[in-house]
Amino acid sequence: MTSGNVMLKHQDVTIERIEKFLSDTYFVRENLYGKLISLKSSEAVKVKVSPKVEGISYKDAIQLEYKDTKIGESFGPSWTNYWFKVTIDVPTDWKDKTIHFIWNSSCEGLIWMNGIAIQGLIGGTWQDLREEYKLIENSKGGEHFEFYIEISCNGMFGVGKDGLINPCDPDRTFELTKAEIRVKNKEANELYMYLQMLYDVGKNFPKESLRKKQAIWVANDIINQCNVNDSRTFSKCIELAKKEFFSQHNSESQTRVWAVGHCHIDLCWLWSFEKTKEKCARSFSTQILYMDYYPQFKFTQSQAQAYQWTKENYPELYERIKEKVVTGQFIPTGGTWVEMDGNLPSGESFIRQFLYGQRFFEKEFGKKCTEFFLPDTFGYSAQLPQVIRHMGIENFITQKLSWNNLNKFPHSTFIWEGIDGSSVLTHFPPADTYNSQADVKEIVMSSSNNKDIDRCNESMLLYGNGDGGGGPTIPMIERLTILKDTAGIPKIEFSTPAQFFKQLEPHRSKLNKWVGELYFELHRGTYTSQATTKRGNRLCEIELHATEMLTSYCELFVEGFKSPNLSKLWQQVLLCQFHDALPGSSIQVCYEDILKIHQQVLVECKNIITQSMNHITGTLLKIDNLPTTSTTTSTTTTSTTECTKNSEFVLAFNANDFEISRVIEIPKSNKDIQAQYINAIQTSYNGLPLGTVSLPPNGFSAINISTSGDNRTINRKPGYPCTAIEKNDASGDILIDNQFISIVIGSNGRIKSLIEKSANREVIKQDGSLGNRLIIFDDTCLFWDAWDQEIFSLEKPLSILEGTCKIIENGPLRCVVQVHYDSKGLPSGNGSVNQTIIVHFNSARVDFETNVNWNEAHKLLRVDFDTNIRAKNANYEIQFGHIERPTHYNTSWDFARFEVVGHKWADLSEYDFGMALLNDCKYGYSTLGGRIGLSLLRSPKSPDDTCDMGSHKFTYSIYPHRGSLQSASVIKEGYSLNNNFYISETPFSLASTTHIDKTFISTNKEAIIVDTIKKAEDGTSFVVRVYESFGGATTFNFTSSILPIPFKSIIECNGLEEVNQSSKSYKFNDTIKINPFEIKTFRFISN
């Protein structure tokens, strides 16, 4: 035996000696690795292959014609599937052996036996390799096996060309490298695992650690006593390892790690939704098999969508999942439909993620989830704690902030508080991964990196291969079992998320609190990448909102009408909000699929809205049955029902929770309306008649289109018209004026001056600064192309687009300036940017309707406004509220937020004056001093090299205002720019004096937004969701202009639409208290 002094003097040499004894590359004939396999045979395995197929069932697959194939044959191209028929004849002399089948096709596969999905296979050579299936224990020799393997021609991480996140290589092929059976040397494999763990301790523990020195000593002693050519020494060495190292146990004060088996499955990323369905089957079947091997093993899985896909495509496997849920080994978690993006979905989308997720889990498995599970997303909205609590969950797990590239997040276990004061118990697994390999390094890191270990010495380890699926491997489970109570290593418990949080609960009072958003200091480009998807998502959210409101009205007031079930449409939209879909970080085929989904949802909504409008119109034409209109609200007047039908009307519906007055274009598709509306006081530049409509909140009006005159008609003249003039000087400037603002547009399209008249304030800084500067920046990053927008990109502006302007509409309803930007300003010289700058007679808002043909590479298009406003902070709309962020870079935490998320608006205000920058489909804002900007388009080249290429249409707006954002109705302007209103397609005749304004459900306070009106999921009532938008406690009453009030009672409920004994009940006119930014959900019980 080597003396201890020599070993200790040469610690690093000894560690490397251990490494070489375990190496699969060096000295394999002399080391332990070379003795892991006792027997192997490829001759015993016969393989035949089918033609390439797409998405066929096992029943159909076994009917295919198969031909012989062999090791070395390749299969492809990318994304295609093949089925293999495998027959095995076990050698007769392999008696009493445990036999393993080995398969490596360099891609993903699934073993099928007798119509049952048995186990997933993952080819290649990386740590995710899973090529082994235990065929039989205690073989009698001579057995015959026949089964099938379905392969998908893609790696665990897709088919990126020459790199993980590179665009797909459509012509990849995958080689069959192994198809054999083996008998493993059981003792050699067990010894190998013990030595590997000793090596990990020696490699990763601190240099002066006693356990490090002990591990190196014991491992070195084992190597000295092990004769690799005499397997009898293996058992002796195993006992030596146990006795000298692993038999030493922890004290009661040792920290504990709760090991949660997990499989992170990206529903799309470097593969499509369709391929994810296969990944689910491979992953889940494998973990169920391991549950049979290891009764102590528990596996947790989130995302109702993944379960739903498995139920639809692999029903037998799904039944086995349900069986394991009952036994407590397969643990549904998370509570949401998918693991969604944490920044970009609307508040209602967040609610629906939980609503449909929790309903699915309760229906399918008999219980709801008790924790929100979102390990991998790119930031976390400050409104999430309230949403989580509103959906009946109190605990939250994630870890992504460990990727921060500037500041280290200071907590592992803490209380996270949202903008309304709601809080959730939150844990960031200290191993800083959701794909832990359950090795010594990461187990110890779960303790050593626990930033709150002085307050709570419990931590979670999320272990298992993931992103592309897979889950825990047998070595992971066995390592955790061996290390369960080994001195120097945290105590380990096989656990579930719920069991873990039960251990945290007693420590709650000692934990620190983090208030506000969990901002992710990386992946800021995901606020902008894949602009078409982001626009589609915004439109779907808006149209579903309107569709639910209209159909709810129709169910109450249109005889025989039944609200359609919109849950399937919602679930499609929620799927597209997955955290690699909506952010823009997936491959091209994903966005082709998402575009189809969004288009389908929008078509369905349009059809339902059209039908609903027709139903309402039909009801109105029954003159004698027109519902009485209240005279007690400001938005309505008494109906008149004269029988003389001498005017043409259209029905207009407003899905905003406030009264709107808009200038509208009558589209060419409405030829019947245009035929009646022939005396328009203004025609648009593209030949469409313009008119003005005023509509009540959450309701509809009958609009007179054939009579000019008062505010009940579409064709009325403004008291203060909007005008535009071109200055008679060399500047070529254009001046637009209305009642509220005066704006000077330079000949190049930039804003030189913007005066808000009520405050007599200049908005644009008058030192040569400008507004509407369209700037192109170099947009490269450190690695994650589609994900990252770095601060240094803003240091390198390449060009400011130069335009030419002309007036194309000149009042009285609106003025429009057309700006054509020179394509020479585009680095590629290939493309176009055109704008129409629009000012309406009745608003201080200036709209910039923008059309871009974008063909750049690694460039960023953004718009900046240099304002004359001095504010230390700016406000940004988020879900159900807004948050404040600094406009300076005082600290590294401030500097890190150089690009932040805002939804429909951001507002920069000093006392009593400010300006909002609004948008209809963008999310990436930046504010520094008085400059406020919006990212419009990016052009990353991986993983989708077509990202954002082609045509785009979007609108951003500026809204100068006197007063605060609350008093100036910035929130309303954001909704107004985004939410549609709807006009019936066919005119109808009523008495010219008829005045019909109907508000379905609203409130008496501007601060309270009625965000959702829908049919309850159980069909027994209607659900109304409101939130307080100003950030202050108040009271409110519900209002309606429909009498008699069609509801007998209102019951407050949670976001799952559940009522319990403590639920408050109200009458329709009761006063209700609400806290700052609070979300409230009510069930309206109809008469």
Swiss-Prot record:
Keyword line: Glycosidase, Hydrolase, Metal-binding, Zinc
Enzyme class: hydrolase
Required cofactor names: Zn(2+)
UniProt-listed GO biological process terms: mannose metabolic process; oligosaccharide catabolic process
Record SUPFAM superfamilies: Families 57/38 glycoside transferase middle domain, Galactose mutarotase-like, Glycoside hydrolase/deacetylase
Keyword Zinc part of the UniProt annotation: yes
Chain sites annotated for binding Zn(2+): H264, D266, D376, H579
Co-factor remark: Binds 1 zinc ion per subunit.
Keyword Zinc among UniProt keywords: yes
E.C. code: 3.2.1.24
Protein name: Alpha-mannosidase G
Organism (species): Dictyostelium discoideum
